[in-house]
């Protein structure tokens, strides 16, 4: 449980818990309720984090008791999420992802995404999916429901060619790529 302010404490900063104002920040702005702009920012921040392929960093965006459905796998808790992501990125090599907001309301965001990767035999895939996200008041994701389909592609059919890491600003979106 996060600490709360008492009447003798200094005034709160935008109802942010005390813990979130130190260097171990538990706040993950933007915070709900979302607007079109903040939902888009949240999706881009998630995309950027996933493109690092750093399981520990990505897992910090989720509550400690976050619940996931990823394809047919059900996960509970940040440790399980981190272990899942480590397995995922050992298998999905040269992973590059683009996310795009589909809808949002209050503390929920729905995104569609596509990512490209290859296996250890050099077979390329484009994975298409949808995610439904629900956030707590501190901007941590407490629920992630993901449906994903893998499409084998030829290496020459790839659309994501930026260097590994963050998708460059100005790179076409999913819609602009016709995906």
Describe these PLM feature segments:
Residues 2-5, 18-64, 174-179:
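Short, low-complexity N-terminal intrinsically disordered segments enriched in polar/charged residues
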Residues 3-8, 84:
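A generic structured-segment signal
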Residues 8, 13-16:
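N-terminal polybasic/positive-inside topogenic patches
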Residues 18-34, 83-179:
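A beta-strand edge to alpha-helix "cap/lid" segment located at domain peripheries
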Residues 38-41, 55-109:
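A solvent-exposed, acidic/Ser-Thr-rich amphipathic alpha-helical stretch
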């Amino acid at each position: 449980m996060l600490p709360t302010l008492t009447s003798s404490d200094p005034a709160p900063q935008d109802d942010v818990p005390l813990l979130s104002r130190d260097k171990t920040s538990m706040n993950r702005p933007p915070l709900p309720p979302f607007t079109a702009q903040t939902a888009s920012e949240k999706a881009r921040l998630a995309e950027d984090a996933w493109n690092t392929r750093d399981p520990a960093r990505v897992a910090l965006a989720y509550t400690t008791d976050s619940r996931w459905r990823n394809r047919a796998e059900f996960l509970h808790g940040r440790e399980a999420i981190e272990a899942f992501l480590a397995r995922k990125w050992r298998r999905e090599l040269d992973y590059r992802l683009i996310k795009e907001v589909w809808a949002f309301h209050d503390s929920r965001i729905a995104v569609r995404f596509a990512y490209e990767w290859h296996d250890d035999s050099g077979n390329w895939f484009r994975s298409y999916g949808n995610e439904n996200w629900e956030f707590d008041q501190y901007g941590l994701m407490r629920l992630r429901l993901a449906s994903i389909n893998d499409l084998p592609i030829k290496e020459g059919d790839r659309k994501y060619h930026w260097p590994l890491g963050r998708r460059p600003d100005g790179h076409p979106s999913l819609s602009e790529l016709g995906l």
